[in-house]
């Protein structure tokens, strides 16, 4: 039977990696870690106008139900252990979106003694969303970039 015959009969061929990654991109459940004004834009992205639900993004209240963490705002030294603890409670595979200049590199408060100069010093970050504060459209674009990154990742060989 040739490939034309298989496709004519209604069969679809793919790899396990592509199938698993396709399902993961359609069901991202973020844990919101809103620390400052960027959290307002994150809530705006989840509201009716931008509706992240249409991308399969459903905000979850517990880290044990989440696979994405959105760090939105200024991360202080006092909150860094809590951020790491919440990240460690999330199930594998897990991804992190750093939202806003403060979460990316300290932002306006970069030279303050109490600010962590980027949440990537505490947890590994997959997508950076720039801006002060970034718009809801920027967060939606960041989610789309994360979905593209998940599609490119080898699921079975991932450690």
Curated annotation (Swiss-Prot):
Cofactor: [4Fe-4S] cluster
Keywords carried by this UniProt record: 4Fe-4S, Cell inner membrane, Cell membrane, Iron, Iron-sulfur, Membrane, Metal-binding, NAD, Quinone, Translocase, Transport, Ubiquinone
PROSITE patterns: COMPLEX1_20K
Gene Ontology CC terms, in alphabetical order: plasma membrane; respiratory chain complex I
Cofactor binding mode and count: Binds 1 [4Fe-4S] cluster.
Membrane topology value: Peripheral membrane protein
Function noted in UniProt: NDH-1 shuttles electrons from NADH, via FMN and iron-sulfur (Fe-S) centers, to quinones in the respiratory chain. Couples the redox reaction to proton translocation (for every two electrons transferred, four hydrogen ions are translocated across the cytoplasmic membrane), and thus conserves the redox energy in a proton gradient.
HAMAP family: NDH1_NuoB
Subunit-structure text: NDH-1 is composed of 14 different subunits. Subunits NuoB, C, D, E, F, and G constitute the peripheral sector of the complex.
Protein name stated in the entry: NADH-quinone oxidoreductase subunit B 1
Species of the source: Burkholderia mallei (strain ATCC 23344)
Phylogenetic placement of the source organism: Bacteria, Pseudomonadati, Pseudomonadota, Betaproteobacteria, Burkholderiales
């Amino acid at each position: 039977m040739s490939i034309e015959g298989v496709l004519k009969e209604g069969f679809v061929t793919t790899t396990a990696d592509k199938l698993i990654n396709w399902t993961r991109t359609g069901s991202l459940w973020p844990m919101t870690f809103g620390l400052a004004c960027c959290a307002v834009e994150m809530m705006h992205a989840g509201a009716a106008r931008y509706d992240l639900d249409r991308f399969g993004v459903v905000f979850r209240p517990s880290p044990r139900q989440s696979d994405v963490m959105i760090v939105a705002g200024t991360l202080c030294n006092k909150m860094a252990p809590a951020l790491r603890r919440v990240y460690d409670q999330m199930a594998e595979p897990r991804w992190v979106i750093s939202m806003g200049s403060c979460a990316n590199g300290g932002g306006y408060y970069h030279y303050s003694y109490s600010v962590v100069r980027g949440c990537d010093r505490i947890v590994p970050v997959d997508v950076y969303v720039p801006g002060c504060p970034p718009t809801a459209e920027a967060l939606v674009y960041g989610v789309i970039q994360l979905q593209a990154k998940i599609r490119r990742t080898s699921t079975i060989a991932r450690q």
